[in-house]
Structures are given as C-alpha cells and as structure tokens.
From Swiss-Prot:
The keyword Heme does not apply. This is Arrestin-C. SMART domains: Arrestin_C. It comes from Ictidomys tridecemlineatus. GO terms for cellular component: photoreceptor inner segment; photoreceptor outer segment. GO terms for molecular function: G protein-coupled receptor binding.
C-alpha cells in the first residue's frame, strides 16, 4: 500500500479561496530557513481580473486584542513578505515546483496557483508566553501567518471574511555537530576547616531534546568537618523580552531534592536524572512555550540559537535554560540545619528538538487536513478529509 502525504488546507469564510500547505513547521537552519511552498485555489468568478496576493507576516504580540479598541496597539509586525501570485510578476519568477506542488496543481486544476515564500534568516522562532487561567484572546509571543486575498492592489481594504489565514511555525532543531557537555566547579572554604569543600558538576553532552532525561553528574570532595545533608537539582527557564523592554523572567521548570548524606572528610560521585516537562508546569503563567498551533500539543520553548552578528532585538524573545546544583551543608551546633550553608554551581542547558528525518512526498495519495471556522466563536476546528489519488478533484 502506498504511503500518503498530508496536506493542510484552510478556506476563507466566503468559500472562494483556499490555501494548501504540505506542513506547518518550517526549519530554521540558523543561516537559512526552509521556504514555505504552497498552492492557492481561487474561484475564477471571484477573481474577476483582480490580483491575488499571498503574504507572510511575522508579528510580535505583547498585549490583548481587546485593548486595541481604546487605541492601544500591542502588536508589532517584525517582517512582511508579499508575493503577487496572479498575475505573476516577472521580477519574482517562480522557482522549480516541489513534488507536492505538482501533485496539488494536477489535482486541483487550472484555478490553482503555486507560491513560494522565502523568509530571511534573522527572524525569531515561534514562541508563546503561556496565558493565565483568566486570560482570553491570542497569547503574547511571536507568531507567523500566511494570508491570501484578492484585490485591485495592496492598499485595498479586505475584510477577514474575504481572506484566508493559516498560522505556521518557524522552529529550530539541534545542530548537526553539538559541542562538548558543560562543566562547572566551585570551591568553598569554611571557618575552622583547614581544607575546602569542592563541588563539580557536568553533563555528558551539550544538547538535550524535549522530554529526554538529562543526566547531571555530581562529584563532591568534602575535606571539611561539615556534613552535606541534601543535593538539590533544578532547571530554570530564562526568558528575555528584548524587543520593547529589557524584561527578564526566570521560572523554575524542574526541582528535586535528593537526600544524600556526605560525611566530613569523604567523597561522593553520582549521576542524577532530571526531566523538565510542560505537563508539570501547565498552569504557570508567563512560561515560554514553542509556538502553539490550535488543537495541537506543544512543549517548553526551545533554546534560542543566535547566529553570530545577529541583532538580538529583532528576535523579540530569547529563551535559555540553566541547571543549578546546590548542596545543603549543615553547620552543626545547636541550631543544626537552621544555619545550613548553600553551595552551588550552574550549567548552561540547550533544550531543543531533534532534527526530523527527511520526508518524501508520495506520488500516489494526498490526505488533506482541513481547518474550518466554527459558526459561534470564529475559532478553528479541525477535520481530516482523506482524498485519495485524483478522486474529488
């Protein structure tokens, strides 16, 4: 049985325009970004000699939509790329068609038109700040949207009903040649102890994938007269909002205490496994997530990989992680643990998706996943329509 290729379809409210995309996640290779290849199907009676455009917009949203009615704008367009699809402009010729575009054009007929949008490399990736329970409307963050409409020119005002919009994501994946794992050390001296306490921590590799257990190796050389009662390991997410302010948010996405007693004048080495997950932080307001598509699960935001020389302000939101290893050192005496000292180190953590395997487009079947608007709330709902071969074209 031949495998089938999934295609995402979105139709305008007036039913006259449809966008077809082979995927909604587009890979950022740091130096280049995958092009957005698709097809637009238009009713010829609706087109009526007008022009048809496809526009890609990257926007940074940092406020609620309902505040726009009082004259406050909380959305900034970071990048807009426009392509005139009908009639095609001679100064922007269409490159070679992809296999999927050829299949769609054959299936949809003469009223279907291909388009290719090649965004620049210095744009942010899709990031969403997790809203609180009382928040409504679109979440704050960076999003990408593909929009198509028919008009006499770009200045003509087009209603939402007469246009079709589909949200896509720009995502980064793990580098092909990651560097060595991070390592950190601290030495602490205590009063009345001749020798110091030495703490070392390291990870076996630089890059870790979402949902993958992270091995944190801890080595302690306790040459003091103190007793170590606990080892605490935590993972912090640091979010820098650099576009309109210098806000920085640090949220602990994993924390666990390990009861390990390390006596005076002794050594200790052990590997601990930690796994930061969104499922354990699903109600944390302001947590950075990978850009969310409706009806699909997401995860903690991936670490931002910055190309050398890139203007960080253009990235809107920068996300990084660190692993903290802390020792609770008992000072003894009458107060015991109440006067315990905290000795710790920090390790940088790169949390990201593995690079997906190359997908090949089937020459046989196309499965179309259509997004239709609900009558009451205008939200998208999703239904899968299997259209095999050329049936129904």
């Amino acid at each position: 049985m031949a495998s089938s290729s999934k295609v995402f379809k979105k139709t305008s409210s007036n039913g006259k325009l449809s966008i077809y995309l082979g995927k909604r996640d587009f890979m950022d290779h740091v130096d280049t970004v995958e092009p957005i290849d698709g097809v637009v199907l238009v009713d010829p009676e609706y087109l009526k000699g007008r022009k048809m455009f496809v526009i890609l917009t990257c926007a940074f949203r940092y406020g609620r939509d309902d505040l726009d009615v009082i004259g406050l704008t909380f959305r900034k367009d970071l990048y807009v790329l426009t392509q005139q699809v009908v009639p095609a402009e001679s100064n922007s010729p269409q490159g070679p068609l992809t296999v999927l575009q050829e299949r769609l054009l054959h299936k949809l007929g003469e009223n279907a038109y291909p388009f290719t949008l090649q965004m620049v490399a210095n744009l942010p990736c899709s990031v969403t700040l997790q809203p609180g329970p009382e928040d409504s409307g679109k979440a704050c963050g960076v999003d990408f949207e593909v929009k198509s409409f028919c008009a006499e020119n770009l200045e003509e005002k087009v209603s939402k009903r007469d246009s079709v919009r589909l949200v896509v994501r720009k995502v980064q994946f793990a580098p092909m040649e990651p560097g060595p794992g991070p390592w950190a050390q601290t030495i602490r001296r205590f009063l009345l102890s001749v020798q110091p306490l030495q703490l070392q921590a390291w990870m076996d590799k630089e890059v870790h994938y979402h949902g993958e257990p992270i091995s944190v190796n801890v080595s302690i050389n306790n040459s003091t007269s103190k007793v170590i009662k606990k080892i605490k390991i935590s993972v912090d997410q640091i979010t820098d909002v650099v576009l309109y302010s210098l806000d920085k948010y640090t949220k602990t996405v994993f924390i666990q205490e390990f009861t390990e007693t390390i006596a005076a004048n002794s050594s200790f080495t052990q590997s601990f496994s930690v796994t930061p997950l969104l499922s354990a932080n699903c109600r944390r307001q302001g947590l950075a997530l990978d850009g969310k598509l409706k009806h699909e699960d997401t995860n903690l935001a991936s670490s931002t990989i910055v190309r050398p020389g890139m203007n960080k302000e253009l990235l809107g939101i920068l996300v990084s992680y660190k692993v903290r290893v802390n020792l609770m050192v008992s000072c003894g005496g009458i107060l015991g643990d109440l006067t315990a000292s905290d000795v710790g180190v920090e390790l940088p953590l790169t949390l990201i998706h593995p690079k997906p395997s190359q997908e090949t487009t089937s020459s046989e079947d196309i499965v179309i996943e259509e997004f239709a608007r609900q009558e009451d709330g205008g939200e998208e709902k999703q239904k899968a329509l299997a259209e095999e071969g050329d049936e129904g074209s």
